[in-house]
Amino acid sequence: MRMGITVGFEHRFAVRALAKLGPADEYIFLYAYTGRDEDSRSESTVRELIAAFGRGAGFRVDLTKPSEALEQIYGLGLERVVLAGGPRLLVLLALLASLLRRSEVYVLPEYSAEPLDLTPLTALCDLCRLSPAKLGIVASVSGRVGIDDVAQLVGRDSTTVARYLKDLSEAGIVKSLGGRRREYFVDPLLTTVARLMQNRAGSL
């Protein structure tokens, strides 16, 4: 696995990322170029990380050209991206590249020792292509629910809902949980995004 980690002036967040989310076959430390003197601090952090772990490579992201920077990050083919520090634009571009490539994506918050898994958001592009009926199902599912429960929530017959859930499951938007009574699960992040998309569509 090729893992990319955004890096700023401090190395502790990147160290936490490697401790919590490693190991990986290859580590790419993404650091920013802004044209300012402070850039040398990020470069120094990357060198310290590579020396400390004995592996990895630095990748300079030129934030003065955001469109090119996005394409460069996307082109790295990262399978997992950890947002562990660096300028806000670097973090934003790394997140966007992750969503477009459908990589695993985690954020290392300042207030918690545990990384947050944002990978469900990689289905965002798929949500934009859903029909209103299927989007309504994603927006309605909370926790583990059965087909009949979903049908009741959205006001449709169970046969139609079962077909929609099968399509959503194959697309990776809904998780199908096995058992005699099959149940379905949508990550709360996706449920919220789908509901907000519904609200926005209703206001146009």
UniProtKB/Swiss-Prot annotation:
Transmembrane segments: none annotated. Coiled coil: none annotated. The keyword DNA-binding applies. Keywords: Antiviral defense, DNA-binding. Induction: Not significantly induced by ultraviolet light or by NaCl. A monocistronic operon. GO terms for molecular function: DNA binding. GO terms for biological process: defense response to virus. The keyword Magnesium does not apply. InterPro entries: Csa3, WH-like_DNA-bd_sf, WH_DNA-bd_sf. Belongs to the CRISPR-associated Csa3 family. CRISPR (clustered regularly interspaced short palindromic repeat) is an adaptive immune system that provides protection against mobile genetic elements (viruses, transposable elements and conjugative plasmids). CRISPR clusters contain spacers, sequences complementary to antecedent mobile elements, and target invading nucleic acids. CRISPR clusters are transcribed and processed into CRISPR RNA (crRNA). A putative DNA-binding protein it may regulate either or both of the Cas protein operons encoded on either side of it. NCBIfam families: cas_HTH. This is CRISPR locus-related putative DNA-binding protein Csa3. It comes from Thermoproteus tenax (strain ATCC 35583 / DSM 2078 / JCM 9277 / NBRC 100435 / Kra 1).
